[in-house]
Amino acid sequence: MHYPEPISKLIDSFMKLPGIGPKTAARLAFHVLAMKEDTVLEFAKALVDVKRHIHYCTICGHITDTDPCYICKDERRDRTMICVVQDPKDVIAMEKMKEYNGLYHVLHGAISPMEGIGPEDIKIAELLARLQDETIQEVILATDPNIEGEATAMYLSRLLKPTGIKITRIAHGLPVGGDLEYADEVTLSKALEGRREL
């Protein structure tokens, strides 16, 4: 199908998003075309603003518009615990259950030899630097319960064991092969309660 160039460009842009194929991209493009101009401009501004103003916290790696992020700044949080997650979306999922009150460390990925991602490609060095703080007593490994997440948890467990810090892994109330961001609060809560030392 031949579309006018601006629509083709918009369809191509939507297709760059994960899970958006040509049909969905075309549907979205035509929806945008039918929207009021001020709504489209507001949408475009939101896209630009998120790219310009959202960055990663220099301490934990979570998404933020301030530095440090609101979690790292919060003096009421338990500074003896760090929960290690793969992505910022996992921090949001953990925070929704309102039961964990410690700090976080976002790895921004997981070890995946098949994809050429090794320990040096994710934020492990930054985690080790944070663990030099002697107030840390427990590291909770909350990587996804899939092959990459398990490999990352095992690697971190072996790497951190000599530090003497208690290393725990969230329990598997989560489906194997699933992602933390899709788990409901009850499942996440049970998984956190049932974490075990590695």
Curated annotation (Swiss-Prot):
Disulfide bonds: none
Stated name of the protein: Recombination protein RecR
Function: May play a role in DNA repair. It seems to be involved in an RecBC-independent recombinational process of DNA repair. It may act with RecF and RecO.
Family annotation (PROSITE patterns): RECR, TOPRIM
Lineage of the species this protein comes from: Bacteria, Bacillati, Bacillota, Bacilli, Bacillales
Assigned keywords, A-Z: DNA damage, DNA recombination, DNA repair, Metal-binding, Zinc, Zinc-finger
Regions crossing the membrane: none
NCBIfam families: recR
